[in-house]
């Protein structure tokens, strides 16, 4: 299944509390013939709050955060799904431009029909160097 997901994003670092926030709102359009698919288009919104901790002489970092996720299918009479995603992002190399994110997505409602999901992502800030540089 292919989705087209345009979205608006906003982020802010709050120096007084040394935390960051990030928010998104968007629309997920499922590509293909509507009669051939078993999911509908949906609205989604996400908000994450976290803080980066620096350790050691060379500034290794760990970034724990919590994300709140909502999504609502269009065209179905189903309730909005709300989830919470505690997660952490850690650098994999010394240059810290390749990072691994790990989290678990827990449903806050409709949990009788929805299970928690383990999630992971790899982030490469290519401006700071090639993927295999800085290890």
Q: Where are the regions that the model predicts?
A:
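Residues that define the transmembrane beta-barrel architecture of outer-membrane proteins
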Residues: 1-4, 37-45, 78-84, 114-118
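Residues on the lipid-exposed face of transmembrane beta-strands in outer-membrane beta-barrel proteins
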Residues: 6-12, 27, 45-51, 86-90, ...
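Transmembrane beta-strands of outer-membrane beta-barrel pores
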Residues: 12-14, 25-31, 51-53, 68-74, ...
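Short loop/turn motifs that connect adjacent beta-strands in outer-membrane beta-barrel proteins
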Residues: 15-19, 53-62, 93-98, 128-135
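Transmembrane beta-strands of outer-membrane beta-barrel proteins
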Residues: 19-25, 45, 62-66, 84, ...
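A mid-sequence, solvent-exposed acidic-amphipathic segment
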Residues: 23-57, 61-63
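Long, repeat-rich segments with strong aromatic
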Residues: 56-62, 69-77, 86
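Outer-membrane beta-barrel "beta-signal"
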Residues: 115-135
